[in-house]
Structures are given as structure tokens and as C-alpha cells.
């Protein structure tokens, strides 16, 4: 009998507690506050994201991980910290990707080599390195950019873009728009070869040097294009 009474008492306590929580949780979370100023994310972005289904629940019923997953779906958001504030608010900390290069003309690369997108009106692409390749190779291309740029700087040359194709063949473009086709494998000896032969290249009148193909074991092939009129 005592055991039965204890069970009944526990059930009543649980039921009343659950009903009390439900009464407190009738109103959904309706407001948020950012803990710091963001570079790219607007209030409209957050409102639109939080309004997506499933709808927000009340303070006790809302799963923080669900809110975090919604916000992480924003392409330029790298990480999120979300905290519930009673009775109906969220405290949100957004960590955004920092763009360090333009990727395939339309997207950006972060410092970690992660590909992400930004609305065109949020950032000016001018001055960013231009990098190209499969999205899975973002980190590799970014590291190559840093190494090749330093290598060229030691030779008084400046780098404009780096590209790798699906076969792992590399092409770089100098700031004077000359394209160096490096192919696969180690690029340092190929750049050395270019530096050696560059002064000896005889550019025809009315033409400019367009590319130097360094994929050969010895020597190189060169191509020219008309000077702009």
C-alpha cells in the first residue's frame, strides 16, 4: 500500500510539474540579441533564418541545437553560440568566415580554406587574390598561393591568380597578366626556368607575351596576343 501511494504521489507531482512547465511554455521565443556586431550578417538574415520551419518553441521546449543548426546553414557563418534567456529570448554569438580570396570568381575562401558565398552587396572583391579549382581543393590552393607568392616575390615578380584543375595541373597568372602553365609536380624549378628565359623572349612588334608553357622537362613554349588598340 505504501509503495502504491508513493507511485501515485510521484505521478501527481510529475503531472502537475509537467502542466506547470507547459503553462510557462505557451508563448514561443519571440526575440533575440546579438552579443557583438557582425561584419556580414544583418538582422534581416537572422529573422528570416529563425522564421524557417520548424517554428521556434517556448523557453523550455526549444532545443538550442535546432537553433544553432538553422544559423549554421547561413553560408558565411562558421560557428554559433546560442543561449536561451527567460522568458522568451535568445542570446546569439555568430562567428563569421573571414574571406581571404575570391574562389572561382563567385565565392570566397576563408583562412581555413573553406569555400563559402556572400551576397554581392556585402563585400567588394577588389584586391582579393583570385583562386580557382575544385571546391575540395580550397585549402590546398590557398596554401599554394602563399608559397608561390613568396617564391615570386624573391624574384621581384608579383602574383595575381592561382588555378588547379581536376587532374592536379597548376596554372598561375602574374600581375602583368602573363600566364605560367606549370602543370603537375614541383613548381619551383619551373619558375626558376621562367626567370632564366624571360629576358630572352623576343616579343614580336604589336604583340604582348600571353603565356609561357613550362610543362616541358627542358625549355618552354611561349604564346603571344595582340596589343590592345
Curated annotation (Swiss-Prot):
- Summarize the protein's role: Essential cell division protein. May link together the upstream cell division proteins, which are predominantly cytoplasmic, with the downstream cell division proteins, which are predominantly periplasmic. May control correct divisome assembly.
GO BP terms in the entry: cell septum assembly; FtsZ-dependent cytokinesis
Asked if the Swiss-Prot or TrEMBL record annotates the protein with the keyword Cell cycle, the reply is yes
Q: What is this protein called?
A: Cell division protein FtsQ
Q: Which domain of life is it from?
A: Bacteria
Query: Subunit details for this protein?
Result: Part of a complex composed of FtsB, FtsL and FtsQ.
Q: Which GO terms describe its cellular component?
A: cell division site; plasma membrane
